[in-house]
Amino acid sequence: MKKTRTANLHHLYHEPLPENLKLTPKVEVDNVHQRQTTDVYEHALTITAWQQIYDQLHPGKFHGEFTEILLDDIQVFREYTGLALRQSCLVWPNSFWFGIPATRGEQGFIGSQCLGSAEIATRPGGTEFELSTPDDYTILGVVLSEDVITRQANFLHNPDRVLHMLRNQSALEVKEQHKAALWGFVQQALATFCENPENLHQPAVRKVLGDNLLMAMGAMLEEAQPMVTAESISHQSYRRLLSRAREYVLENMSEPVTVLDLCNQLHVSRRTLQNAFHAILGIGPNAWLKRIRLNAVRRELISPWSQSMTVKDAAMQWGFWHLGQFATDYQQLFSEKPSLTLHQRMREWG
């Protein structure tokens, strides 16, 4: 069936929402989800009631795994991504998200703040944020509606302090034993209810699970502190510079953005730009620009909402005028020919 709806594939939706629209996940029959994904665009669509846009930064065939359970005004999930990503995220309104990364392996970032073994990420719903994650990365997510926190404020000793922190901080330092306890609880809950999802249809089961989760969250948040970053000021500013660079590229899709354009727009020298990209990503700005544009073309080729009907249309839209070189670069990054990406979309959606 052909889709006629138009959508912006490269930006999140920021229009004011109707007052009566509630995006809190609905707990009905379908409240346990498990998915295996082979594409970052597909993976970005897996989390219920979120908006996300992912860019694949490292070459290879992507593999992702996602598991979630939905309670009454509570969402719990585990996300695994096999390749390094840059993520734009927007959680459902009137909620708070908590990201609990695995303690093993390379560290991820929320904005310019590093998420180490004693840190968690947090953002209010309806507020866009950016994550940078390395290869082979696992993170647990807990989303609590503001209604739940208000109704169950007794699980917090000092709710005003905690809520102020959640509204104004993107990363918190927590006790490692509390983080480990929450990690174990969430993992056990996901494993149990993925094996027996019908048990979550019982209101009593959902209530006990939700209350136990709130107690574990409360123990962690009561002793949490705003994160004091150990990363240098220069590295933090470099990360902010990269975020601004990406937004500029995607806001100016009518013409290919060059390194000179970035220098002029961001008011930095070519050397500063080079230093920022090499310090944070290990590649130069030219290579990065190409990867961001290749990801944009892939979204145009793979999305059922895309208006691009040929590889040439999508490539030219993002400034790839040498189609042979474009096809080579595309296959090197995604381990797939662009014609195959488009063919799969046309076969499925017409």
UniProtKB/Swiss-Prot annotation:
GO terms for molecular function: cis-regulatory region sequence-specific DNA binding; DNA-binding transcription factor activity. PROSITE patterns: HTH_ARAC_FAMILY_1, HTH_ARAC_FAMILY_2. InterPro entries: AraC_XylS_family_regulators, Homeodomain-like_sf, HTH_AraC, HTH_AraC-typ_CS. It comes from the Bacteria. Activates the transcription of the eut operon. Also positively regulates its own transcription. Probably binds ethanolamine and vitamin B12 as effectors. Competes with ethanolamine ammonia-lysase (EAL, the first enzyme in the EA degradation pathway) for adenosylcobalamin. PANTHER family: HTH-TYPE DNA-BINDING TRANSCRIPTIONAL ACTIVATOR EUTR, HTH-TYPE TRANSCRIPTIONAL ACTIVATOR RHAS-RELATED. This is HTH-type DNA-binding transcriptional activator EutR. It comes from Escherichia coli (strain K12). The lineage of its organism: Bacteria, Pseudomonadati, Pseudomonadota, Gammaproteobacteria, Enterobacterales.
